[in-house]
Structures are given as structure tokens and as C-alpha cells.
């Protein structure tokens, strides 16, 4: 049974402005595994990746019904599988979490659906 659905839309340039003011912003949003991948990318790809992870984690927190205030960005990890599909590999949710991240123009959109397996 679906127990939560969250969506977030993020302007990539807004994330870039924050990152350029303080590169530690990436460390706040990304887990160690996500950060290791982030460090391998070109600047433009870094900004798209960071915005996508931000949007994905915001969408997850909305699906949980808590908002990011009761969760931290470090509580949620999103890693791409071998086909490039984003997968939530770490979260406080005990059921199944589905995520989709889409990039278009200067924006990133993420959608998360939470399913209770009980």
C-alpha cells in the first residue's frame, strides 16, 4: 500500500549559487558515497547532480510527511544503479522507496513514492 508521495522541483542555478558561496554545502547534502561520485564530475554535472540529490531528499522527506527538518540530508542516500537509475539505498523508512529524478532546462524534479510492505 502506498503510504506517501513527495515531489520537489529545484532550480539548478540556485543550488550553484549556494555551492559557489560555500563549497561545504555539498558535504551537508551528500553522504560520503554520494560525495565521492560528485567529486569525479565536471562543474556543470556536479551542479545537476547536487540539485538532483537535494530535490530527491526533499521529495523523500515530503513523502515521509516530516519535511527535511525532522530528517537530515545524511539520513537519505541516493545512488544510481548499473543502468543509471537512481535508487534510495539508505533511509529511515522500513518499506520500499521508489524515486525518479528528471532534468530539463535549468531545473531538476524528483518524485518519491513510499510503499508499506506489511
Curated annotation (Swiss-Prot):
Similarity annotation: Belongs to the P-Pant transferase superfamily. AcpS family.
Keyword hit for Cytoplasm: yes
Catalytic reaction annotation: apo-[ACP] + CoA = holo-[ACP] + adenosine 3',5'-bisphosphate + H(+)
Provenance organism: Streptococcus equi subsp. zooepidemicus (strain MGCS10565)
Cofactors: Mg(2+)
EC id: 2.7.8.7
GO cellular component: cytoplasm
Gene Ontology terms: biological process: fatty acid biosynthetic process
EC category: transferase
Compartments, record wording: Cytoplasm
Gene responsible for this protein: acpS
InterPro entries, per the entry: 4-PPantetheinyl_Trfase_dom, 4-PPantetheinyl_Trfase_dom_sf, ACPS, Ppantetheine-prot_Trfase_dom
Segments traversing the membrane: none
Chief place of localization: cytoplasm
Gene Ontology MF annotations: holo-[acyl-carrier-protein] synthase activity; magnesium ion binding
Binding site for Mg(2+): 8, 58
Protein name (database record): Holo-[acyl-carrier-protein] synthase
Keywords for the protein's UniProt record, in alphabetical order: Cytoplasm, Fatty acid biosynthesis, Fatty acid metabolism, Lipid biosynthesis, Lipid metabolism, Magnesium, Metal-binding, Transferase
Cited function: Transfers the 4'-phosphopantetheine moiety from coenzyme A to a Ser of acyl-carrier-protein.
Amino acid at each position: 500500500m502506498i503510504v506517501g508521495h513527495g515531489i520537489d522541483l529545484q532550480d539548478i542555478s540556485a543550488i550553484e549559487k549556494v555551492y559557489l558561496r560555500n563549497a561545504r554545502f555539498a558535504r551537508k547534502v551528500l553522504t560520503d558515497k554520494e560525495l565521492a561520485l560528485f567529486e569525479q564530475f565536471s562543474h556543470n554535472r556536479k551542479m545537476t547532480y547536487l540539485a538532483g540529490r537535494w530535490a530527491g531528499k526533499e521529495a523523500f522527506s515530503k513523502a515521509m510527511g516530516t519535511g527535511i527538518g525532522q530528517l537530515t540530508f545524511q539520513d537519505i542516500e541516493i545512488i544510481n544503479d548499473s543502468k543509471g537509475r537512481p535508487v534510495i539505498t539508505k533511509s529511515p523508512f522500513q518499506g520500499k522507496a521508489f524515486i525518479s529524478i528528471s532534468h530539463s532546462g535549468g531545473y531538476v524534479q524528483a518524485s518519491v513514492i513510499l510503499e508499506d510492505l506489511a
